[in-house]
A protein has these predicted regions:
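Short beta-strand segments enriched in small/hydrophobic residues
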Residues: 39-44, 78-94, 200-207
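Hinge/beta->alpha junction and helix N-cap segments in small-molecule ligand-binding domains
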Residues: 91-100, 118-126, 168, 178-188, ...
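Alpha-helical recognition/docking segments in bacterial nutrient-uptake
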Residues: 1-9, 14, 19-23, 85-191, ...
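N-terminal helix-turn-helix DNA-binding module of bacterial transcription factors
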Residues: 1-81, 376-378, 383-384
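Short acidic/polar active-site loop segments enriched in Thr and Asp
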Residues: 38, 140, 199-200, 230, ...
Length: 384
C-alpha cells in the first residue's frame, strides 16, 4: 500500500514549533522529516551535480525554505571532501597592489562557488611557518603570492594540494603560474630611458628576498649591458618610502654626481626618492634627474607626483589565477601539464622622466620598436 507523503507546508509549521520549543538550530535531519525523504537525499540536494529526482529536489527545497535551513558547510565538506575554501598566501610587505589583488581574487573565486582564507607573511622568508598553518585547514587549493622553494612545491605534490603561484616563478620545476613578466618590465624601462638619452643609471632595489624585485633588477641590468651602457649603481632598499631618500643619497655618493636616471623597486620608494631630490637636495626632476617606479599604486598618480612607472594588469591576472586554480581543483585528480600564464606590464608615461625620443648612436639604427620597448623573450603563454 502506497503512503501519501505529508504536505510540506503543514509539516513545516508543526516542526518549526518543535524546534522553537527546543531552542536549537535547524538541521538536515529536520528538513528530511518535513520533506518526507532520507537525510542522505537532503545532502544530495545541496551537492552540485549530485543525482536527485526533480520531485525530491522540489520537496527538499520547499522544506528548507520554510524551515529557514542553512546548509552546514563543515558538515557538507565531510561528505564531499571539499571545503570550497581556497587559501591565499600574500607577502604583505611586497606590494601595495595586493589589497586590490585580494579583492579581485575574492570576487572571481566567489563567482565559482568558493571562498578565500587569507594567510599573510610579514616577509617572504616566513613561508615555512605559514604553510604549517595552512596544512591545519581543509582547503581545496592554494594561490601563493609568496616565494616557494622546490622543497615547498614537493610538499604540495605529496599532499596532492592544487597550487597556483601568483607573480612568482620557479626555474627548477614546472608549476601552475600566473605572473607579470618582471624581467621584461625591467628591460622595457631601461629601453625607454636609454632611447631618450639617459646613460648613467642607479637602481634602488626592492626587498632582497623578493623574486619579483630580483627579476626586475636583472632585466634592467641585462638591457644596459646589451646597449653598451655602464653597469648601474645598485643600492639595497626595502620597498618603502625611507629607502627612496637613503638610496638616492647612496647612489650620488657612489657616483660622485647625480645620475641621469634612477629606477626604484616600487612606487613608494620612487616617491621617497622624488621628495628627497626636490625638497632636500634641490635636484630638478625630471630636468636633472629622471625617476621611475614600479606598480602604479594609487599615490603614484597624485598630481604632486605623476610618477613614471609600470602597471601590472592585476584584475586580469587575478581572474586568470582564480580560473586556473578552480580548473585544477575541479579536475578531481586528473593529470595535466602545468600552465604558465604571463602578462605584460603597461608603461605609464608620467612626469618624472625625460622621455623625448633621442635614439642616439648608443641604441644604434638597427634597433626596431620591439627591441626599444622590450626584449621579445618568449613566454609559454603571452597575454597582452
Amino acid at each position: 500500500m502506497n503512503r501519501t507523503k505529508p504536505c510540506v507546508e503543514t509539516a513545516a509549521i508543526a516542526h518549526k514549533a518543535l524546534i522553537a520549543r527546543e531552542a536549537r538550530r535547524v538541521t538536515s535531519y529536520d528538513v528530511a522529516l518535513v520533506a518526507g525523504v532520507s537525510q542522505s537525499a537532503v545532502s544530495r540536494c545541496f551537492q552540485q551535480g549530485a543525482s536527485v529526482s526533480d520531485a525530491t529536489l522540489a520537496r527538499v527545497m520547499k522544506a528548507a525554505a520554510l524551515l529557514d535551513y542553512i546548509p552546514n558547510a563543515a558538515a557538507r565538506s565531510l561528505i564531499t571532501r571539499r571545503s570550497n575554501i581556497v587559501a591565499v598566501l600574500i607577502a604583505s610587505q611586497a606590494n601595495l597592489q595586493y589589497p586590490e589583488l585580494l579583492g579581485e581574487l575574492s570576487q572571481h573565486i566567489g563567482a565559482r562557488g568558493r571562498r578565500v582564507l587569507l594567510f599573510t607573511l610579514a616577509r617572504e622568508t616566513d613561508v615555512d611557518r605559514v604553510l604549517a598553518d595552512v596544512w591545519q585547514y581543509q582547503v581545496d587549493g592554494v594561490i601563493a603570492a609568496a616565494r616557494l622553494s622546490s622543497e615547498h612545491i614537493a610538499e604540495f605534490d605529496r599532499r596532492r594540494m592544487p597550487l597556483v603561484l601568483f607573480n612568482r616563478s620557479l626555474r627548477e620545476r614546472a608549476v601552475n603560474t600566473v605572473t607579470c613578466d618582471h624581467h621584461e618590465a625591467g628591460r622595457m624601462l631601461v629601453s625607454r630611458l636609454a632611447a631618450a638619452g639617459h646613460r648613467r643609471f642607479g637602481i634602488i632595489a626592492g626587498l632582497e628576498d623578493s623574486s619579483v624585485a630580483q627579476e626586475r633588477r636583472r632585466g634592467a641590468s641585462e638591457r644596459l649591458a646589451e646597449l653598451g651602457l655602464p653597469a648601474p649603481v645598485v643600492v639595497p632598499g626595502q620597498a618603502d618610502y625611507a629607502s627612496g631618500a637613503a638610496g638616492l643619497r647612496a647612489i650620488i655618493s657612489a657616483m660622485g654626481a647625480v645620475p641621469d636616471a634612477i629606477i626604484c623597486g616600487s612606487d613608494v620608494t620612487a616617491i621617497g626618492c622624488l621628495d628627497c631630490a626636490r625638497h632636500e637636495l634641490g635636484i630638478e626632476v625630471p630636468r636633472q634627474l629622471s625617476v621611475a617606479g614600479f606598480d602604479a599604486v594609487e599615490s603614484s598618480n597624485w598630481l604632486s607626483y605623476n610618477l613614471t612607472t609600470l602597471r601590472q594588469p592585476m584584475p586580469r591576472m587575478a581572474m586568470a589565477a582564480a580560473e586556473l586554480l578552480c580548473t585544477v581543483i575541479d579536475r578531481s585528480g586528473g593529470v595535466a601539464a602545468p600552465e604558465r600564464r604571463v602578462f605584460s606590464a603597461q608603461f605609464i608615461n608620467g612626469a618624472t622622466a625625460r622621455l623625448e625620443p633621442v635614439f642616439s648612436s648608443v641604441l644604434g639604427p638597427a634597433l626596431g620598436a620591439a627591441q626599444v620597448h622590450g626584449t621579445g623573450l618568449p613566454a609559454p603563454v603571452a597575454i597582452m
